[in-house]
Amino acid sequence: MSVYSFSDVSLVAKALGAFVKEKSEASIKRHGVFTLALSGGSLPKVLAEGLAQQRGIEFSKWEVFFADERIVPLDDENSNYALCKKLIFDKFEGFDPKKIHTINPELLKENPIDPQNVADEYEKQLVHVFANSSTVKVPVFDLLLLGCGPDGHTCSLFPDHEVLQEDVAWVAPVTDSPKPPKDRITLTLPVVTHAQAIAFVTTGAGKKDILPIVIEDFTSKLPSALITRNNLTRTSWFVDDEASANLERSSLKVFPQ
């Protein structure tokens, strides 16, 4: 595990941009595509700022999924896709709309909407992309970019939620999210933990109390802690000094320039 702390968010963004470019280039060189899953929240803004400082990224070879998504229209202010479209997909040239995988808007016309159907259809999109390249039971993303809530949740994997026990489905519905909107879909824990690389991006003083628990407490059952602990050699944290204020200094590493 590598935890990188920076004096301000702009430096977090710069390092994240360099990290993502490196992962993109290595993946494209290895198998011709860069498979990525994004979260919402503050992450897209930080990522967009970081990508803007990089040159030569082959966005046309990015296959983009969402680590979780709210079951709302694609132009809704709560949609992770809408946020990423505004800040990233519309801003940088090269993205192929066919390679940006959203929830199926046709399923949102059902009354009532069935979150299980939305999750199942999204899983079919994963199967279509990964079936030819992966013989394992779960897809193996090149990179997952995740956030971490003040409660230690990530994606829509919330503490003590039954979805944490799901070990068959790749995508699961969540119909009782503790934060609105309540209906969502999320990648399941086995999918997240099988990624080639995972990067958490967490900033602000509001995260300083949770980070020691998810990073340094190896008995924690919080989702972000479980993911980190199961992927120590493949997990990186990009944080600012406000968020890392309560971490042991020995936990921090210098980001390679």
Swiss-Prot record:
InterPro entries: 6-phosphogluconolactonase_DevB (IPR005900), Glc/Gal-6P_isomerase (IPR006148), NagB/RpiA_transferase-like (IPR037171), PGLS (IPR039104)
An example molecular function term from Gene Ontology annotations: 6-phosphogluconolactonase activity
Name of the top EC class for this enzyme: hydrolase
Family annotation (Gene3D superfamilies): 3.40.50.1360
Pfam families tied to this protein: Glucosamine_iso
Reaction(s) this enzyme catalyzes, per UniProt: 6-phospho-D-glucono-1,5-lactone + H2O = 6-phospho-D-gluconate + H(+)
A GO cellular component entry from the record: nucleus
Keywords assigned: Hydrolase
Family: Belongs to the glucosamine/galactosamine-6-phosphate isomerase family. 6-phosphogluconolactonase subfamily.
Function: Hydrolysis of 6-phosphogluconolactone to 6-phosphogluconate.
Record's protein name: Probable 6-phosphogluconolactonase
Organism: Schizosaccharomyces pombe (strain 972 / ATCC 24843) (Fission yeast)
Upper classification of the organism: Eukaryota, Fungi, Dikarya, Ascomycota, Taphrinomycotina
